[in-house]
């Protein structure tokens, strides 16, 4: 597989020649992050909104007749326009409320007592009965997510990382082979706008055929987010360690 041939590790870019060394450090770095205070959802939203505004300005500059390079971005793929609409506070808060059932930044909801199953996704629910016999549900991050995205949908790695950040997870992204550096550029912009996110995003341009490296990443993950067809799903099911949650998107 081709690609940008770089690694993003705690906000800094490294050559893939250092992959083994960095993977050796990764679990300890993730554990340090997870033992901290956790990722504030408002910081995530604020960073994403700023990113959307910056990208929107570039699109507007291009629309006024400037070239993409003059606007500060040598590429403006079609999906970037959708991304700018996606990265608005209204849309992000709506997404959090409809998919998690909580107000943005609250991280909890209440509903009548009884059993409720948690569906698949990059978070999980912990239930506590209150004295009023209502069930208070705390939405907690799953922990560490490994994102394996398909190469036939431009921008998919960015959208997958956004999902993981909104639920407070540490995210390891395995880039698709034909990404060409587009996703990394967007993610670097996001970290520049909100530096607190650097400890929650790791990007590896690793070949799917590098089984030892893939296995090491899978072993660090509490959940694996898989975007792809049946063969991709089956391959991850075979290699995922027992107990790892698989979050499958076709």
Give the residues covered by each predicted segment.
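Conserved small-residue-rich beta-alpha loop and adjacent elements
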Residues: 127-191
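Residue-level signal for inorganic ion chemistry
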Residues: 44, 168, 224
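Alpha-helical scaffold segments in soluble metabolic enzymes
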Residues: 50, 185, 189, 235
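Conserved NAD(P)+-binding/catalytic subdomain of aldehyde/semialdehyde dehydrogenases
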Residues: 197-250
């Amino acid at each position: 597989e081709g690609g940008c041939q770089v690694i993003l590790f705690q906000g800094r870019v490294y050559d893939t020649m250092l992959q083994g060394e960095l993977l050796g450090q990764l679990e300890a770095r993730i554990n340090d992050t997870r033992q901290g205070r956790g990722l504030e959802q408002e910081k995530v939203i604020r960073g994403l909104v700023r990113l959307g505004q910056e990208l929107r300005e570039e699109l507007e500059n291009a629309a006024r007749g400037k070239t993409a390079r003059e606007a500060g971005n040598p590429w403006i793929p079609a999906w970037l326009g959708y991304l700018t609409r996606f990265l608005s506070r209204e849309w992000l808060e709506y997404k959090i409320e409809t998919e998690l059932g909580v107000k943005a930044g609250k991280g909890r909801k209440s509903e009548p007592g009884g059993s409720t199953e948690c569906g698949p996704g990059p978070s999980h629910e912990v239930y506590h009965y209150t004295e009023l016999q209502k069930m208070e549900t705390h939405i907690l991050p799953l922990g560490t997510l490994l994102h394996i995205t398909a190469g036939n949908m431009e921008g998919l790695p960015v959208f997958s990382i956004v999902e993981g950040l909104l639920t407070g997870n540490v995210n390891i992204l395995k880039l698709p082979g034909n990404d060409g550096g587009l996703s990394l550029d967007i993610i670097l912009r996001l970290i520049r706008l909100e530096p607190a996110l650097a400890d929650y995003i790791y990007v590896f341009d690793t070949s799917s055929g590098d089984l030892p490296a893939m296995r090491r990443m899978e072993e660090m993950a509490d959940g694996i987010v898989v975007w792809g067809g049946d063969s991709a799903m089956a391959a991850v099911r075979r290699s995922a360690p027992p107990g790892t949650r698989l979050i499958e998107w076709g």
